[in-house]
A protein has these predicted regions:
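Residues at the starts of beta-strands that form the adenosine-phosphate
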Residues: 2, 90, 113-114, 138
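Conserved acidic residues
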Residues: 26, 113, 153
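Receiver (REC) domain switch-region micro-motif
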Residues: 28, 91, 155-156
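Glycine/Thr-rich phosphate-binding loops of Rossmann-like dinucleotide-binding domains
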Residues: 38, 103, 164-166
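NAD(P)-binding Rossmann-fold cofactor-contacting core
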Residues: 110-133
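Rossmann-like adenosine-cofactor binding region
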Residues: 135-179
Length: 179
């Protein structure tokens, strides 16, 4: 098995994937900003890929290209390795972009008490909550500056701030009791 990083522009994505599979590659990992294209490009999508509208893994089986999103399962596996239980917990999900969309289905399967999506753009967070409307009773949308009336058990950062070397400014009372 060999593993190598290749830079591919979005306009060249489909041609590059086809070329790699023709060269004998059996699978590919895909990262930002190409995950949505990967999901749309595939002939067959896993349930996770369909739900979140993105894929980070492509593979060829016969003449068909398959897509999967393993981000959510990876996060859940990490929680399990750390003995972190999500059932009946209050979870804050920072951000409502592609990463949040990719992990939300897996989070919901673990039956948290509530998932509160905090985002700068409330409209974008509402759209994400609407996408998973069957579970909306457990999903709340809040402004990133809104004072919470509960203490979260788990906070997940799915924003791009860390990759952009930016800070996320959150109200102190999310993490600390007021004196």
């Amino acid at each position: 098995i060999s593993y190598e990083a290749l830079h591919v522009e979005s306009v060249d994505f489909e041609e590059s994937v086809r070329s790699l599979f023709q060269k004998g590659y059996t699978g590919l990992n895909v990262t930002l900003p190409l995950k949505q294209l990967a999901s749309e490009f595939a002939d067959n999508q896993s349930e996770e890929s369909r739900l979140c509208g993105s894929a980070n893994t492509l593979w060829k089986q016969g003449s068909a290209i398959y897509a999967d999103s393993t981000d959510g399962r990876g996060l859940i596996n990490d929680f399990q390795k750390q003995n972190v239980e999500l059932k009946d917990k209050d979870v804050i999900l920072l951000g409502s972009g592609g990463s949040a969309r990719a992990i939300l289905p897996s989070l919901l399967k673990k039956n948290p008490k509530r998932i509160s999506i905090l985002n700068r753009s409330e409209d974008k967070a509402l759209a994400l909550a609407d996408k998973f409307s069957q579970s909306q009773q457990r999903i709340q949308v809040r402004s990133i500056s809104e004072k919470l009336n509960f203490k979260p058990d788990i906070v997940i950062n799915s924003t791009s701030a860390s990759t952009l070397k930016q800070d996320i400014l959150l109200p102190d009372d999310i993490f600390y009791e007021e004196a």
